[in-house]
């Protein structure tokens, strides 16, 4: 994301950059970018004693050798962040042309761009409940430290009054002026080249707000008087707070501040090094290839280091349905939290309609892990104010606070122990009047008092069998340990929530704790497609503990389809008429009716095969022309399987929060940072009558913005300004063309590569022109490093009207 100033053209009239302008705080770029380099040895997380000291020596040596090689080989490169605990590597700002050289340096395991993350609260609401979530625990989290990795906390809010606190030894850390005896850390993690004037401050007086609300839920002081005279309290009101501002960049789409993976990983690294007991991330983005998901991997490492990561599940269910759960909630070891209505307000708990659902779209993990209040939650906002807000952003800090309470009472518990205690002791929540499946509510509504006496700890705490084909045998062994008073014989049964003909879960009728239990699904050769999910119930007298499980029986229709090989980028034509109809639903995400894109595609399909011999930055297609009446639209799947979409990038919707067109439909589908393998581009239509001919553009590794050239800087009054725009990769997206003259919106017409900008009404003399244009790949870019808006060109110029 960086960057340097743009290129002054020969006439000294126009100025080009490869990302949005400086007025909105979006970093500029011209030929440089920030990437995350991972080195060969594992990070230090979880390594102690003599082995830990040896590992530290080895990591330090590797990093010193890498830094020396970087200086000698790429003199202009700069190390922005160093990672030792949660990753072994560094964030490096390099010329983009030098990235292949960087990959070839000795000891380099991988070079990744990372993802951009945004906040996952929904909107402020008008009614709800304050007070304190009734955890049933007597303690208040005294001495525990909760790190909030978010958009910056207003430490002056009365909910965080330092009265009665003493700064713990070794603190404050970071920018001391933004700390108190309650908020003991204040750090800001700013991408290189960011121009937003408040980016480096731990609290942004213009854009920050979300983190202050989140922190109040987790650890606001008990007995604070809120608006309307209500007495409120955080879940762990005596806990310390660490403020890690990793979201620093304003967004064009108005979704608040965004942050990128390099900075979020740096914040996780700092929180672990600072001694936080719990970290909360109420942020999210569509899942990317799990082996390349830097933030999720860093959270896994934080858990290995003994820090509890708690993450919001996301708010996309209404639009994207099952498989909408976002990264970094996809982290295997994190506690991922769904949102329910506030039981303190309603007396019962139902899942919020927006709360994202599992399985995770690419890794197919069973998430979320738990549910907590996330609807109409009263908490602090900057300026000593209070608001009710809704979102899984509000649910996660309830669990962060509960985790702090439990760790205070059980200091020897591992992260896995705490996670298992919470998941196994949850109570059922409802959705649409029925008990929610684990893919919606995880282990259920968290019950910290029951988790305090877990009895049995399961490993894994929940089980995903993934996609199972008929007739294929599989099994997963779960280890059960005594969590305190749980030793002995327990009865075992299945609590089914969703069943499918021909599939069942086979279990022994009893199990002795400590011991193991084997979960063995039976899927007959004639089994129907569908989900088999529910809970394995362990019962001993009145005591019940549960293990959530999920699988889906699949019969891929596209497995028998014929695919045409796409060997080179370029323009292609196709026609779905006369082709077979082999698939009607694509997942994951499994878009519901009325969601963001077509949910059911019942037309005939035409397939084109993309084979990658190496990982790629991206690939994709855009339909540029359809015959009259045709409603053909694209999807991208793993070869031959409509159940394996390449995540959100496979759906024809604009996914880039830095674009004003965020959320709009667009006839583009692709994959972001795909690994080597075979993929199918599928052209389908909602109905058989929507079949027809079409033309499409195909690209691979489009990481460059369009070109834009002003043909003449001096024109007569009334004569249009002409700008030549072109893109050799995915092509110009005309919906992204934005023209401003002297700061005001202006009109332009794009035809055959020339943009005609009207000068009607302009006075004679000099004027400032600003043009922004993106290509179609930009609509796929949840990966926005390097740089932010890597596939967007901005042209600014002084023009003269004669």
Where are these regions (language model features)?
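C-terminal edge strands of extracellular/lumenal beta-sandwich accessory domains
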Residues: 539, 552-583, 608, 635-649, ...
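Substrate-binding/access-modulating region of protease and related hydrolase catalytic domains
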Residues: 142, 243-333, 344, 360-365, ...
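Acidic, Ser/Thr/Pro-rich low-complexity intrinsically disordered segments
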Residues: 498, 592-655
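C-terminal subdomain of the subtilisin-like protease fold in secreted/lumenal serine endopeptidases
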Residues: 80, 370, 408-477, 481-484, ...
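Subtilisin-like serine protease catalytic core
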Residues: 30, 134-260, 274-277, 304-306, ...
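Extracellular S/T/G-rich loop segment that most often corresponds to the catalytic His/Ser-adjacent loop
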Residues: 177-194, 329-404
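Hydrolase catalytic cores
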Residues: 215-219, 246-247, 277, 371-434, ...
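Inhibitory N-terminal propeptides of secreted protease zymogens
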Residues: 23-120
């Amino acid at each position: 994301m960086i960057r340097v100033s743009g290129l002054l053209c020969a006439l000294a009239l126009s100025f080009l950059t490869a990302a949005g302008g400086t007025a909105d705080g979006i970093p500029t770029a011209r030929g440089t970018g920030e990437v995350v380099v991972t080195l060969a040895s594992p990070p230090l997380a979880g390594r102690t004693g003599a082995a830990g000291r040896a590992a530290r020596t080895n990591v330090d040596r590797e990093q010193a050798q890498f830094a020396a090689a970087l200086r000698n080989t790429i003199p202009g490169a700069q190390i922005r962040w160093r990672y030792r605990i949660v990753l072994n590597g560094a964030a490096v700002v390099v010329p983009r042309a030098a990235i292949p050289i960087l990959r070839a340096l000795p000891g380099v395991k991988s070079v990744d761009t990372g993802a951009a993350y945004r906040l996952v609260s929904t909107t402020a609401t008008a009614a709800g409940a304050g007070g304190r979530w009734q955890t049933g625990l007597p303690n208040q989290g005294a001495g525990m430290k909760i790190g909030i990795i978010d958009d910056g906390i207003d430490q002056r809010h009365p909910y965080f009054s330092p009265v009665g606190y003493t700064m713990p030894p070794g603190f404050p850390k970071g920018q001391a002026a933004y700390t108190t005896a309650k908020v003991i850390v204040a750090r800001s993690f700013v991408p290189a080249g960011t121009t937003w004037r408040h980016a480096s401050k731990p609290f942004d007086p213009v854009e920050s707000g979300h983190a202050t609300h989140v922190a109040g839920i987790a650890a606001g002081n008990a007995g604070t008087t809120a608006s309307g005279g209500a007495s409120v309290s955080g879940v762990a009101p005596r806990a310390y707070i660490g403020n890690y501002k990793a979201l620093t960049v304003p967004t064009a789409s108005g979704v608040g501040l965004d942050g990128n993976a390099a900075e979020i990983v740096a914040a996780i690294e700092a929180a672990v090094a600072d001694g936080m007991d719990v970290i909360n991330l109420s942020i999210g983005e569509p899942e990317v290839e799990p082996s390349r998901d830097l933030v999720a991997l860093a959270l896994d490492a934080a858990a290995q280091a003994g820090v509890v990561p708690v993450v919001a599940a996301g708010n996309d269910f209404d639009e994207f349905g099952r498989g909408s759960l976002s990264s970094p909630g996809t982290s295997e070891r994190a506690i991922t939290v769904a949102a329910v209505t506030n039981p303190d307000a309603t007396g019962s708990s139902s899942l919020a309609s927006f709360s994202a659902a599992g399985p995770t779209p690419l890794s197919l993990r069973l998430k979320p892990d738990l549910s907590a209040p996330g609807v109409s939650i009263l908490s602090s906002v900057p300026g000593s104010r209070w608001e009710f807000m809704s979102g899984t952003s509000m649910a996660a800090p309830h669990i962060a606070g509960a985790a702090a309470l439990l760790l205070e009472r059980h200091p020897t518990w591992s992260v896995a122990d705490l996670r298992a205690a919470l998941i196994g002791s949850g109570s059922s929540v409802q959705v649409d009047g029925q008990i929610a499946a684990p893919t919606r509510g995880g282990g259920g509504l968290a019950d910290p008092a029951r988790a305090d006496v877990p009895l049995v700890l399961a490993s894994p705490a929940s089980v995903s069998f993934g996609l199972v084909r008929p007739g294929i045998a599989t099994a997963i062994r779960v280890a059960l340990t005594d969590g305190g008073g749980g030793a002995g014989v327990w009865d075992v049964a299945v609590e089914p929530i969703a069943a499918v003909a021909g599939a069942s879960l086979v279990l022994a009728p009893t199990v002795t704790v400590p011991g193991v239990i084997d979960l063995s699904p039976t899927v007959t050769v004639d089994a129907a497609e569908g989900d088999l999910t529910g809970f394995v119930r362990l019962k001993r007298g009145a005591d019940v503990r549960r293990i959530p499980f999920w699988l889906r029986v699949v019969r891929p229709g596209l497995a028998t389809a014929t695919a045409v090989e796409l060997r080179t980028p370029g323009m292609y034509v196709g026609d779905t008429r006369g082709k077979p109809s082999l698939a009607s639903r694509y997942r994951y995400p499994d878009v519901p009716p009325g969601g963001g894109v077509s949910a059911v595609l019942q037309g005939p399909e035409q397939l084109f095969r993309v084979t990658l011999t190496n990982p790629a930055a991206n690939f994709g297609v855009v339909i540029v022309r359809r015959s009259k009446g045709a409603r053909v639209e694209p999807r991208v799947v793993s070869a031959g399987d409509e159940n394996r979409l390449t995540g959100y990038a496979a759906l024809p919707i604009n996914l880039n929060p830095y674009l004003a067109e965020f959320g709009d439909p667009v006839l583009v589908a692709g994959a972001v940072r795909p690994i080597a393998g075979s993929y199918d581009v599928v052209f389908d239509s909602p109905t058989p009558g929507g079949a027809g001919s079409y033309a499409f553009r195909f690209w691979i590794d489009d990481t460059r913005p369009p070109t834009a050239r002003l043909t003449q800087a001096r024109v007569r009054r009334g004569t249009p300004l002409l700008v030549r725009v072109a893109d050799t990769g995915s092509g110009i997206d005309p919906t992204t063309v934005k023209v401003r003259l002297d700061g005001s919106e202006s009109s332009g017409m794009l035809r055959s590569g020339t943009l005609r900008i009207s000068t009607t009404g302009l006075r004679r003399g000099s004027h400032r022109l600003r043009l922004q244009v993106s290509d179609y790949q930009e609509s796929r870019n949840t990966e926005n490093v390097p740089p932010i808006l890597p596939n967007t060109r901005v042209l600014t110029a002084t023009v003269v009207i004669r």
